[in-house]
Regions:
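Serine/threonine-rich, repeat-prone extracellular segments and beta-strand-based repeat modules
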Residues: 1-17, 70-102, 107, 144-181
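Thrombospondin type-1
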Residues: 1-40
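General secretory precursor processing signal
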Residues: 5, 23-26, 57, 104, ...
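N-terminal cationic amphipathic segment used for targeting or macromolecule association
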Residues: 5-6, 28, 32, 41-43, ...
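Compositionally biased regions
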Residues: 10, 37-45, 49-51, 82-84, ...
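Interdomain boundary/hinge segments at the C-termini of tandem beta-sandwich modules
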Residues: 31-37, 109-113, 183-184
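Solvent-exposed, low-complexity, repeat-rich "mucin-like" stalks and linkers
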Residues: 38-70, 114-144
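Hydrophobic beta-strand residues in large extracellular and virion-surface proteins
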Residues: 45-47, 63-65, 80, 93-95, ...
């Protein structure tokens, strides 16, 4: 069989030979082709979180990178960089191949206005009618009046019987988070 003189590595050819088993004379030599780096561009990238609430701090989700069923190692097989990851909008994480890997792949995630910082007005005690009771809600974020259906959704529970009802106002679109209020 072949005896390896020098193993091939990425970008570097190797060599091997066959020798006589009795006298050890080299009978044949051959080149081992250089190994090529594998492109990371088709890797699947999973983020630990895809939506963040804005708080002025850089958002860096955890990253899992898989290629051909193998989970790659951060620092060994790839490096991670983030861009546009502090302000409200679309942020990006870029995975760049390292070591045995080449190329890059990117994934985006969202940073949305923190709906919990919105102010809600128009919730008051209502008289029992035997019907579902709703409220004339106004939601403001940094002084701007938000639109029901576009910026938030409203849902009610326990709002037909006498007692405490709950209204849940959930951020939508460029807002994330939920505000819960009660009324009687």
């Amino acid at each position: 069989g072949w005896i390896v003189n020098k193993a091939a590595s990425i970008g570097v050819k190797g060599s091997k030979h066959k020798e006589c088993t009795v006298c050890k004379k080299v009978l044949e030599t051959a080149e081992i082709p250089a190994l090529s780096r594998i492109s990371i561009s088709k890797a699947s990238v999973t983020l630990s979180t895809s939506t963040y609430a804005y708080d002025g701090k850089a958002k860096k989700p955890g990253v899992t990178v898989k290629l051909n069923g193998k989970t790659l190692k951060n620092g060994t097989d790839y490096t991670v960089s983030y861009s546009n990851n502090t302000k409200v909008g679309t942020a990006k994480v870029t995975i760049t191949g390292k070591g045995n890997y080449t190329g890059s792949v990117s994934k985006t995630y969202s940073i949305k206005n923190n709906f919990k910082k919105a102010t809600v007005s128009g919730i008051s005690t209502k008289a029992f009618t035997g019907k579902n009771i709703t409220q004339s809600i106004t939601v403001k974020y940094n002084g701007k009046t938000l639109k029901n259906g576009t910026d938030y959704t409203v849902s009610y529970s326990n709002n037909k019987k006498i007692g405490t009802a709950t209204v849940k106002i959930a951020g939508k679109g460029s807002y994330t988070g939920t505000i819960t209020k009660t009324f009687k």
